[in-house]
């Protein structure tokens, strides 16, 4: 029936599905569903969205029959011992059934008022008349039993969404018998199915035998899993059995080399995985999280052995990706026509969703009653459990090597190509998401990763991606995950001790993004890149500023040999965060200052002699610290109503007089500028970093003019010439305006074009609702860790001043003096790591992020064609789906909830002072 005439007849037949109310089951249109189409695009062409919606809205009985016919034919093919057989059980028929289900189900999910129907149709127990047939021929007359049973369900038993119990039916009145899918394993909640037989007396004392079947969705999911491990369909013909639990690719759980997968087998796997992804996609069509029976059954109730083999297959297939067009991965060129790309995308998305799923209490109660379990019986995610139990070193080596290869490919391409036209892009962001889950759910793997030679390279690559996409709203969720990973790894002492090594790729990585920096260590790369991520105006990651600063706190006790460039960034942050205008805007802004002062104090107390540049920078910036120490609420409360930047004429003239020795971070003179403290940011979109215009510590020549700094209001017994070289509120100049300013513009005119402190919006709420009080001020001001900083100022200000006034003396001499000195009355502190706490709301946000990338990949055709979701109303339901995890979507309740959670992270840190709580929190998950 593959000819043109049969296709035209088939097209006329399926048109009747929407126009004719109740098509008989003996009509030839049902059989032609799996025999006529020859490809997936043909199936999608025969069933356009309008036809499916019309059938759903006006001929729903036909749609129910269609689903029953397709699933039953698929079950019959699966049960055929010769499948796949071109004569009796062809694989093409199974593929057509799979394609039709993949096409139709999204349009059922998009209609919200079908929720009760979903529960009755897919999750109600069924009865089947026992038949002696063993072949795969489908007797359509037998479907009347199913339809009668569905009608009895609708008439007699109204399912309430508030009750998680199994709907009552003639079948459910019998005790459910639990049988194990795997005879060799113990019976438990993870490997139990329901079935059995009974004899029901009919009218006239005629006895017929019926089987108590599993629900239709359970049977469909079991069939899908069987087809994923079917000889000749998704497994090589050399497999010993028709359905064999064989891991698809070499890697975790395999000791023997697996046979290479042919393109035909790969395409069949893609088709089945596409259906599996559609079956668990109801979350896309709901504005909030819903209880998913499907995901819970797949992750918690399915057969243990199958779960284990499928988990290993998903991981190995995802990480074994070696596309033919990989050479172009550093650019935006992604190989769309490579079947391995689609297979890897599908396996990675399903893997992430399975590992992340936490069963909803409603679903847990449903399956407890469904499986006759005790009320307190545990139903947990088996994928997460088995992954957490990985412990073989060979498995860890495979994970680390393959993750490093995939993450480092775009990064290594930067140094491999002389001319980089575009910024390097990551073609597989799901790899970063999987890395986060790996270190979150397997503590032994995290320890192995930290001790591996690739540990610092992992940290560099992840931080680089956060820096790369800091202004890309589409990848804002990815940046958050990157920052979480870096923060989580920064809590490990073994890794922190490695961060003082020279970072070989730092200059090439930063230059690829337009930053000019000198050679630096891994620790300096983290500090400078963190500065460029957070210290930007209107940053979408302002709520993550506590995470970023606490990452610096974690590595601070181990940092050595900080350069002047890095110290300048720390001093800029300190100057911005200590501004009264910033501190009194919000009742929680002081937390950022506390975290930064903790980091600086930790460096001073633990590595004073190894960081003379930082000590010198503190002395240069001493006025900020002295003012902060002597700050009083009555004296500064009025700054709340004053402009953030206020320079008088005297300050302006002094501002201009110091422009002659202005240099950039790399020591090169700045051309056509007569200002020194101007930052470069964006005007209308995400703002860029405070860049090279803001550092006075560029070279010995520019640092030698310490004695020329004017004296202003120093209220401590130190030389008045040691004056702050930073403004309390650094000025910011938009990138758009930078190229339009005339060469000889005055500073007063330039100030008018400058914006305010880039931290001005961090953690901000309505400032009109907050009135600072003495109790609030004293509660945090007394906790500021200024003792070690003030000790440096008190002990070394005069010696440094005298050293700088000596003839032929340079800044290097002063730095050498500090390096050979000992800080009195200051003792090292024990490192106190702050750990990130992953909670259930964060799980929900992570799941939405995974679906965000799923939709993005599907829209681009990266998960095979045709698209799975673009023709359904998932986009219209969410508005622009790319805004689900976007920080600018103020109308999205999910993102608002996520931002609220992230804004409160600082409170979590205050409640978690030691690593003991961290370990206990992991055990309680």
UniProtKB/Swiss-Prot annotation:
Residues 650-664 have a biased composition (Low complexity). The keyword Cytoplasm applies. The keyword Zinc-finger does not apply. It is found in: Cytoplasm; Golgi apparatus. Residues 650-671 are annotated as: Disordered. Keywords: Cytoplasm, Golgi apparatus. Required for the localization of ubp5 to the Golgi apparatus. Involved in detoxification of cadmium ion. Belongs to the hid-1 family. This is Ubp5-interacting protein ftp105.
């Amino acid at each position: 029936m593959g000819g043109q005439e049969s296709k035209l007849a088939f097209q006329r037949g399926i048109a009747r599905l929407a126009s004719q109310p109740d098509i008989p089951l003996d009509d030839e249109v049902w059989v032609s569903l799996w025999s006529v189409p020859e490809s997936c695009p043909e199936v999608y062409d025969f069933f356009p969205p309008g036809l499916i919606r019309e059938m759903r809205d006006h001929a729903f009985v036909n749609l129910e029959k269609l689903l029953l016919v397709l699933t039953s034919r698929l079950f019959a093919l699966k049960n055929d011992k010769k499948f796949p057989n071109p004569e009796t059980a062809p694989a093409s028929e199974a593929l057509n059934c799979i394609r039709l289900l993949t096409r139709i189900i999204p349009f059922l999910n998009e209609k919200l008022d079908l929720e009760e129907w979903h529960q009755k149709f897919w999750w109600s127990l069924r009865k089947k008349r026992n038949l002696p047939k063993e072949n795969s021929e489908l007797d359509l007359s037998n479907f009347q039993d199913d339809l009668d049973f569905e009608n009895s369900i609708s008439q007699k038993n109204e399912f309430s969404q508030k009750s998680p119990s199994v709907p009552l039916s003639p079948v459910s009145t019998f005790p459910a018998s639990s049988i194990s899918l795997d005879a060799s394993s113990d019976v438990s909640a993870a490997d139990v199915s329901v079935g059995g037989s009974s004899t029901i007396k009919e009218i006239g004392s005629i006895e017929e035998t019926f089987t108590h079947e599993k629900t239709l969705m359970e049977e469909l999911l079991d069939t899908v899993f069987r087809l994923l491990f079917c000889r000749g369909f998704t497994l090589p013909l050399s497999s010993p059995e028709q359905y064999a639990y064989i891991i698809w690719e070499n890697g975790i759980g395999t000791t023997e080399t697996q046979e290479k997968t042919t393109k035909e087998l790969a395409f069949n796997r893609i088709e089945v995985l596409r259906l599996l992804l559609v079956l668990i996609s109801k979350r896309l069509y709901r504005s909030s999280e819903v209880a998913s029976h499907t995901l819970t059954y797949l992750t918690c109730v399915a057969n243990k052995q199958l779960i284990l083999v499928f988990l290993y297959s998903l991981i190995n297939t995802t990480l074994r990706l070696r596309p033919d067009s990989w050479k172009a991965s550093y650019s935006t060129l992604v190989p769309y026509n490579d079947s391995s790309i689609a297979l890897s995308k599908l396996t990675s998305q399903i893997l992430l969703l399975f590992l992340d799923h936490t069963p909803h209490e409603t679903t847990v109660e449903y399956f407890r009653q469904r499986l006759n379990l005790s009320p307190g019986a545990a139903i947990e995610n088996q994928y997460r459990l088995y992954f957490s139990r990985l412990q073989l070193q060979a498995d860890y080596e495979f994970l680390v090597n393959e993750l490093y290869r995939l993450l480092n490919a775009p990064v290594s391409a930067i140094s491999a190509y002389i001319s980089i036209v575009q910024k390097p892009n990551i073609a597989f962001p799901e790899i970063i998401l999987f890395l986060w889950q790996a270190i979150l759910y397997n503590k032994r793997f995290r320890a192995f990763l930290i001790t591996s030679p690739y540990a610092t390279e992992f940290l560099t690559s992840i931080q680089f991606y956060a820096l790369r996409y800091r202004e890309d709203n589409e990848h804002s969720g990815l940046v958050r995950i990157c920052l979480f990973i870096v923060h989580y790894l920064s809590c490990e002492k073994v890794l922190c001790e490695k961060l003082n090594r020279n970072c070989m790729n730092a200059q090439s990585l930063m230059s690829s993004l337009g930053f000019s920096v000198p050679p630096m260590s891994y620790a300096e790369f983290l500090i400078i890149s963190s500065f460029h991520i957070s210290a930007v105006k209107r940053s979408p990651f302002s709520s993550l500023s506590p995470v970023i600063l606490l990452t610096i706190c974690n590595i601070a006790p181990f940092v050595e040999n900080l350069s002047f460039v890095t110290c300048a960034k720390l001093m800029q942050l300190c100057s911005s965060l200590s501004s009264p205008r910033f501190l009194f805007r919000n009742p929680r802004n002081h937390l950022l200052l506390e975290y930064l002062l903790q980091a600086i104090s930790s460096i001073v107390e633990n590595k004073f002699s190894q960081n003379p540049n930082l000590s010198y920078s503190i002395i240069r910036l001493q006025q900020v610290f002295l003012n902060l120490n002597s700050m009083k609420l009555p004296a500064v409360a009025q700054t709340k109503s004053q402009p953030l930047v206020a320079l008088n004429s005297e300050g302006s003239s002094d501002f201009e007089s110091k422009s002659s020795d202005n240099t950039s971070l790399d020591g090169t003179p700045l051309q056509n500028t007569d200002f020194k403290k101007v930052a470069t940011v964006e005007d209308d979109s995400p703002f860029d970093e405070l860049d090279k215009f803001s550092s006075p510590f560029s070279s010995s020549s520019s640092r030698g003019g310490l004695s020329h700094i004017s004296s202003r209001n120093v209220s401590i017994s130190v030389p008045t010439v040691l004056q702050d070289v930073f403004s309390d509120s650094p000025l910011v100049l938009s990138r758009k305006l930078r190229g339009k300013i005339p060469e000889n513009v005055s500073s007063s005119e330039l100030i008018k074009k400058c914006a305010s402190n880039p931290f001005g919006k961090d953690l901000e709420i309505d400032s009109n609702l907050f009135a600072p009080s003495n109790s609030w001020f004293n509660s945090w001001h007394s906790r500021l860790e200024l003792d070690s900083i003030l000790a440096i100022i008190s002990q070394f200000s005069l010696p440094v001043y005298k050293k700088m006034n000596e003839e032929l003396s340079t800044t290097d001499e002063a730095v050498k003096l500090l390096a050979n000195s000992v800080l009195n009355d200051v003792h090292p502190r024990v490192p106190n790591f702050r750990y990130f706490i992953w909670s259930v709301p964060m799980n929900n946000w992570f799941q939405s992020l995974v679906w965000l990338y799923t939709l993005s990949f599907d829209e681009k055709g990266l998960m095979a064609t045709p698209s799975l979701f673009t023709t359904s109303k998932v986009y219209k339901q969410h508005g622009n789906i790319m805004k689900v995890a976007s920080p600018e979507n103020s109308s999205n309740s999910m993102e608002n909830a996520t931002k609220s959670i992230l804004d409160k992270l600082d409170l979590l840190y205050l409640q978690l002072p030691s690593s003991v709580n961290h370990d206990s929190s992991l055990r309680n998950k």
